Amino acid sequence: MDAEPDGSALAEDLRAAVAAHLEAVGALDAEAVAAGFAADAVFSTDDDQAVGQREVYTLFRDAFADAATVDLELARMVVAGDTAACELTERIRWRSGATLELRLAAFYTVSGGLITRVRVYRFLPG
């Protein structure tokens, strides 16, 4: 993982929040995912939007329902202020055996060690 050389406390909070999020997703743990978000946080993709911890929990619980494994590999993170821009690869294997690999760009905003906003852009294969 490459990271911009910003040693500030906020940058460290950002890196820690992103790392915890990726770990919780990899563990298919919707409760741990939601715990990393502020009470009024917003998580959005082109297809979904969740506002608040409860909706974040529900979104991830439903997303994990048919997943056997999810791996989010962080290739690069650039920190600017309270936001981290991340390049990721998402690998999903469903219980059916089907697999999917996507490239992602995700922007995380953090305050007080909690994620307040995530915007994910997926680059579909083909």
Predicted regions and their residues:
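Short, low-complexity N-terminal intrinsically disordered segments enriched in polar/charged residues
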Residues: 1-36
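A solvent-exposed, acidic/Ser-Thr-rich amphipathic alpha-helical stretch
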Residues: 30-81
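Short, surface-exposed coil-to-beta transition loops
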Residues: 71-73, 100-106
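A short hydrophobic beta-strand element
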Residues: 81-90
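Hydrophobic beta-strand positions in extracellular immunoglobulin-like domains
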Residues: 90-92, 110
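Short, cysteine-centered beta-strand-loop-beta hairpins and adjacent loop/turn segments enriched
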Residues: 92-101
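Short beta-strand edge/turn micro-motifs at domain boundaries
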Residues: 103-126
